[in-house]
Amino acid sequence: MDVEKLVDEDHCVRAIWELAGRLDLRRYHEQIAAVEGSAGREHTDPRLLISLWLYAYSRGISSARELARQCEYEPGCQWLCGLQPVSHRTLSGFRSENKAGLDDLFAQVLGMLSAEGLITLERVTLDGTKIKANASGNTFRGREKIAAYLKAAREQVRLLNEEAENEERLAPRRAAARRRAVRQRTSRLEAAWREVERLQQEKQHDRKDFVARASTTDPEAHVMRNGEGGTVPSYNVQVVTDTKHGLVVNVEATTDAIDYRQLDAALERCEEKVGQLPQQIVADGDYTNHASVQSAAEHGVDFYGSWQNSWKASEQDALGRKAAFVSTAFPYDAEQDYFVCPAGEKLQHRAVLNRRHGVRTHVYRAPKGVCSACPLRDDCAPPGAKPEWRRSVTRIEEPGATTAFKAKMKTEEAQQTYAQRSRVAEFVHAWMKERCGLRQFRCRGRVKATMEATWVCLSYNLTRWFALRRGLHPTAASL
C-alpha cells in the first residue's frame, strides 16, 4: 500500500508532522540517550509520538489504548506511523513523562505564534475550570485507615522482595509487574499520608473538629464543586489566554478549589515560562480581591475584574433590617469621623483592625445606653439581641491600588474590556471539554494533570493556528 495516498495533501496531519519537524526536540532525545544501553524496547521517535498525540487530541482522543487502536486503521494515524503499530504503554508513558521537554515544546510553539504576530500579550484573560481527577470519592480515607493500608502495603513489598530473592513462582514478567504495582500503590499511600498530615496541620487552627482525608488513588486531588452542582475529586485548571486570537499562553492544574489566590500565581508563571508579563489581564469576580489588585499593581499589569463587595445589603436584610437601617445607608461625616444612625445618634470611632494586604477596618459604635432605650431598636437590632447591645458599623480603608481599581472599573471603557472575558476564556474551556473530551484526567497527580492539560492546549493552539493560516474564522474552524 502506498502510504502517501492515505491522506490528502492538505490533511491536517501533514501540517502537524511538518511542524513537529521544525521543533527542537533535544530535551526528548537527551532523555532517550540517558537510558541507552539498558534493557528494554527500542525507543520510538519523539517526533512521531508528539505528532500522534497532537493529532489525537485534535480529534477528541485522550485514551492511549484508543490511540494505539487508531494506529491500526485510521488513515491519519497510519500515515504518521507508516503502517507500523505503536504500543499503548509507549504512548501513555510519553504523554506523562519528561515535563521539561513538554514545557519546552509549548514554549517553542508560543515563540512561533508570537513571531507571526498571533500572540501579543497586550491583553490576556485568566479563568479556571474544574476537571475531574482520575479518582473516586470512595477512595478518600482518614489517617488511621491510610496508616493501616500503608503498613500492609510495606509488608507486601517485603514479602515480594523475599520471594524474588529465593525463587520466583510466577513468570519473570508477571512477577516484575506485580512488584511494580505494589510499589506504586505503596508510593501513593505514602503520598496520601503526607497529604493528610499537611491538611490536618493546615486546618486544625480554624476547625478543631476537622478530620483530614485524602484519596489513596490520587492523593493530590481535592473534592471540589463542579458546574453541575455536585462535588467530586478534581483539579482546578487555570488557563491564561491571549485575547487577540484566543490562543492559550499558559495552563496549570492547581489543588485550590477557589480562584481567590490564583491571579498572582498566574502572573508569576507567565513571567517564568513566557518570558514577559501581559500588559492587561482580565478575570472574573472570583479573582477580584485586595491581594489580586495589589499583586497586579506591583507587577505593573493593568487588571480588569468584577469587584464583589464582602458586606452586602442583603446580608443586613437577613438580620431583619429595613433599607434605612443598613449600615451603608448611615451618613458619614469625614471631617468629624463619625456615622449618624436613623435616630440621629452619633456612632463614634472605637477601634482599627489591621487586615492583610494593607486593608484597615475602622469600627464605629453607639454610646452606652443609647440603643437600649431607642424607639427604633426593633428595626435596627438583630432578633434576640441582648439589652446591652449597641449598634456598630465599619468603614473599610483601602489601599490606593484598590481605590484606583474601583474607580477605573466604573468607566465604560473598562466595562467594555471586561466584557471580552467570557467570550475568550470560556470558549477554551468548552473546547477542552467538548472537543477533546477532557472532563476527566487520564493521568494521576497534579504535575501529570498539568501535562495532560498542556497537551490539550497545545493541540488547541495548533488547530487555531492552522485555521488562521487558511483564512477561516478561528472559532468556527475549531468546532
Where are these regions (language model features)?
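A general alpha-helix detector
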Residues: 2, 48-54, 90, 108
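Helical catalytic core of nucleic-acid polymerases
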Residues: 24-28, 34-41, 46, 70-83, ...
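Long, acidic, intrinsically disordered low-complexity segments
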Residues: 1-9, 417
